[in-house]
Amino acid sequence: MPENYTPAAAATGTWTEEEIRHQPRAWIRSLTNIDALHSALNNFLEPLLRKENLRIILTGAGTSAFIGDIIAPWLASHTGKNFSAVPTTDLVTNPMDYLNPAHPLLLISFGRSGNSPESVAAVELANQFVPECYHLPITCNEAGALYQNAINSDNAFAVLMPAETHDRGFAMTSSITTMMASCLAVFAPETINSQTFRDVADRCQAILTSLGDFSEGVFGYAPWKRIVYLGSGGLQGAARESALKVLELTAGKLAAFYDSPTGFRHGPKSLVDNETLVVVFVSSHPYTRQYDLDLLAELHRDNQAMRVIAIAAESSDIVAAGPHIILPPSRHFIDVEQAFCFLMYAQTFALMQSLHMGNTPDTPSASGTVNRVVQGVIIHPWQA
């Protein structure tokens, strides 16, 4: 670890805060490294991407799985390639449903430690099921099994994140966002690279700076018992990750949910009461934004939630009608870029809510039944 990697300067004295704060710097470091790997990556990927029937699966467990939820929709539309997101936890239990031997496969495995039992098993199962299988692990741990196995394999190319993104805190913060940015830079280098992404890093740094020492919270403090994050398209993945952060860092003391704004009406809205905080991630796409704002206006009219907060790049009459956060000024961001901004608020909220509720964010599970690297998983051998 770098010598200056210490939580001493963090107001809360936690690794989690330090790891939230260093994200913008870590992204640029990682994308600079990927720029330098461009030729080697091309040599590995170009022959694969020319295969018309290539499947590209983004996989991981927990937070690492949500990376795919956030970025796969944009990567698929931007590149025209067959990107999909499937958690390792599904690949391992139901490999026959996801691993088609008739199609070549590129498995992109995300992992902070690279040692999750399901992540290691998913790679082995993919090799077992798919005759023409390739691997691109993106991981934060040089000593982890994902990285070590890949560098010794002929069908793999490993991409290593900066050491400081191997988060020491319980919850994944800088690890998820750096792996996200890095995967985008691998497959869309003309759009996402160390130069273009500085706008995202600068905007996110402005968000973190605006929150000061974090003591005032992000959405204030109130005796809410539930929080719901809502986002459309890939932003539903960001909403899912945001909900998990709260659940993890408060050890379940604050119940957390996620959905899309349109999906929320179909039953899940039943959970909204006067102890519920609802946060809406408003899309930057003019078409999608209409649906987000429709639901936001509906929640204002319902007047059932304790608080409904919109986070958006720009204001509107509907946004301004209730509590809201407008992102610091910048160029127009597509939603996959805006997701990084939304996660800054969500991570910080989870950290401060954890402390506010008497938890220790770096080790929130007092019972020890939930671990930083998952334990207790039995991997059963596949028998055809």
From Swiss-Prot:
Effect of a null allele: Deletion mutant does not grow on N-acetyl-D-galactosamine.
Membrane spanning residue stretches: none
PROSITE patterns, sorted: SIS
Molecular function terms, GO-annotated: carbohydrate derivative binding; hydrolase activity; isomerase activity
GO CC terms: plasma membrane
One GO term of the biological process aspect: phosphoenolpyruvate-dependent sugar phosphotransferase system
Coiled coil: none
Similarity annotation: Belongs to the SIS family. AgaS subfamily.
Protein name per the record: D-galactosamine-6-phosphate deaminase AgaS
Biological source species: Escherichia coli O157:H7
